[in-house]
Amino acid sequence: MTVFEGNFTEDISSLRFAIVIGRFNDLVTDKLLSGCQDCLKRHGVDVNPDGTQVDYIWVPGSFEVPMVARQVALSHRYDAVICLGAIIRGQTPHFDYVAAEAAKGIAAAAFQTGVPVVFGILTTDTLQQALERAGIKSNLGWNYGLSALEMASLMRQLRPRNEDKPLELLENNPQQALMEG
């Protein structure tokens, strides 16, 4: 029996990432981005905005993140997409709607494209809780970067041998695509 698991021993320099960041609550999202970049850099990824491994895409807020994440994943130029945002509860139900739709949209982007899309949207009751999760006590941005590295590695291992086949063939008739590989 074969065991598949994401690892960090492969050639990291060949991996490409897109990071989609919500600008709203940027006091928090800037810190999440820093933590994510720190993780990727320590694992050998060139996080320079002028480099070839990471593209940064800023959107107005967490509600817009899933649409852009899906579009980016559909391009199949990236091994993983990392979504960063912060939704902080207010005094209206708005929080519930935005948080639910962001979560559903990010999951749908991954399922519909086959590209790992990491859910890095903080949903907290207070700004203090968000800041604690973005750097005061720990920085979950680091965890989101690590998840992206692991999932990118795992998905590379799970690719069909004939990855040069058109995606439509793999999706519509995976059995035939594997036999032709």
Curated annotation (Swiss-Prot):
GO terms for cellular component: cytosol; riboflavin synthase complex. Its EC number is 2.5.1.78. (2S)-2-hydroxy-3-oxobutyl phosphate binds at residues 91-92, 133. It catalyses: (2S)-2-hydroxy-3-oxobutyl phosphate + 5-amino-6-(D-ribitylamino)uracil = 6,7-dimethyl-8-(1-D-ribityl)lumazine + phosphate + 2 H2O + H(+). InterPro entries: LS, LS/RS, LS/RS_sf. Pfam families: DMRL_synthase (PF00885). Pathway: Cofactor biosynthesis; riboflavin biosynthesis; riboflavin from 2-hydroxy-3-oxobutyl phosphate and 5-amino-6-(D-ribitylamino)uracil: step 1/2. The keyword NADP does not apply. One of its GO terms (molecular function) is 6,7-dimethyl-8-ribityllumazine synthase activity. Keywords: Riboflavin biosynthesis, Transferase. The active site is at 94 (proton donor). It comes from the Bacteria. Catalyzes the formation of 6,7-dimethyl-8-ribityllumazine by condensation of 5-amino-6-(D-ribitylamino)uracil with 3,4-dihydroxy-2-butanone 4-phosphate. This is the penultimate step in the biosynthesis of riboflavin. This is 6,7-dimethyl-8-ribityllumazine synthase.
